[in-house]
């Protein structure tokens, strides 16, 4: 809990970027001794900084709730890296609960991630490189009106800024953001063009 004297700073917010998701790879002849015979894949689920930065200054622990068929399905990771590696054969929803450091005095963040084991197909526009499947998402955690103690702790850190360009190890970047903006603008332009064509056709039909 935050100290009683730690007042919240009105009209101010602090954001920190994270990436979360999972990677998976099909197991071959070499497999963990404890892996059940029916398990086909090894996977890792995680919550990280965009470039692997230390995020333990604002995240205290991450709780992963696996499918009930796993022994001890509620797994607590209370030190970085906030990740969990397991084996399995099927995809399922993993409940992820992010608990913040005591100074934050904030409620936990609760969300779900669909564990992806198999490659995306080309039909849905997504792909996985090589034999490793990756299902990773970028998000930003926003702390509205943080208390003074937590705000002071946050500004001591650089803020996990996105890199300018994409790299094999970090696709989330300002370059990717601009590419998404360009795609959206192209889509809007195409819709505007089709609307104008339809408008002209309607005007021609009415003039007949």
Swiss-Prot record:
InterPro entries: YEAST_sf (IPR038704), YEATS (IPR005033), YEATS_dom (IPR055129)
Gene Ontology MF: a single term: histone binding
UniProt keyword list: Activator, Chromatin regulator, Coiled coil, Cytoplasm, DNA damage, DNA repair, Nucleus, Transcription, Transcription regulation
Entry coiled-coil feature ranges: 176-208
GO cellular component, one term: NuA4 histone acetyltransferase complex
Keyword Transcription regulation attached: yes
Pfam families: YEATS (PF03366)
Domain YEATS: 8-157
Localization per Swiss-Prot or TrEMBL: Cytoplasm; Nucleus
PROSITE patterns attached to this UniProt entry: YEATS
Chief location bin: cytoplasm
GO biological process, one term: DNA repair
Entry-linked Gene3D superfamilies: YEATS domain
Similarity comment text for this entry: Belongs to the YAF9 family.
Domain notes: The coiled-coil domain is required for assembly into the NuA4 complex.
Subunit structure: Component of the SWR1 chromatin-remodeling complex and of the NuA4 histone acetyltransferase complex.
Protein name: Protein AF-9 homolog
Species of origin: Eremothecium gossypii (strain ATCC 10895 / CBS 109.51 / FGSC 9923 / NRRL Y-1056)
Gene: YAF9
